[in-house]
Regions:
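Hydrophobic transmembrane alpha-helices and immediately adjacent juxtamembrane helices
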Residues: 1-167
């Protein structure tokens, strides 16, 4: 069962890559800033909310904003994966009727799109962290990589469950 599941996804990997690429291009096509929206939106939200929290609760703004940004990025990815997985088969109805592809690529498609946006915003997080707290920036920051992979697998499973539950 596992071999056929992953084998089907591996067999349709080029279709999956094409869908992800096309969805990302369509998402940012008519935008003046393009992919920068994936960076600017969580960054601006973190700066605004972090500034308000720092003033209201008398906290150091250099600590509050990176912590808020570090929590907002994964949360945005999880909610995008769950929401996209919930409607993955409904949105792909036309493809499922016309093409002979593994249907499990459609929830994975939404998770891949969210993960790419997460990687963009993580780059902004590292730059922000380097600017606000350069003394705390070190090799231990690389420990986020295994965490991102675990979160990708979790969100993929969650999107699979949500997509099947919504049929």
């Amino acid at each position: 069962m596992t071999k056929s599941f992953f084998g089907g996804i591996w067999h349709d990997r080029y279709i999956l890559a094409s869908f992800v690429n096309r969805d990302l291009q369509a998402r940012y096509r008519r935008s003046l800033l393009g992919v920068l929206w994936a960076i600017i939106t969580p960054l601006a939200l973190s700066i605004i909310i972090g500034t308000v929290y720092a003033v209201l609760f008398n906290q150091d703004i250099k600590v509050t904003i990176p912590i808020l940004f570090a929590g907002l990025n994964p949360w945005t990815f999880i909610t995008a994966s769950a929401g996209g997985g919930n409607t993955a088969f409904i949105n792909a109805e036309g493809y499922l009727k016309q093409l002979s592809v593994n249907p499990q690529i459609f929830p994975l498609r939404t998770v891949c799109i969210g993960f790419i946006n997460l990687l963009y915003s993580m780059m902004a997080f590292y730059v922000l962290y380097l600017v606000l707290q350069p003394q705390a920036f070190g090799a231990e920051m690389l420990m986020v990589v295994p965490g991102l992979l675990i979160m990708f697998v979790f969100c993929w499973g969650f999107a699979q469950i949500a997509s099947v539950a919504n049929l």
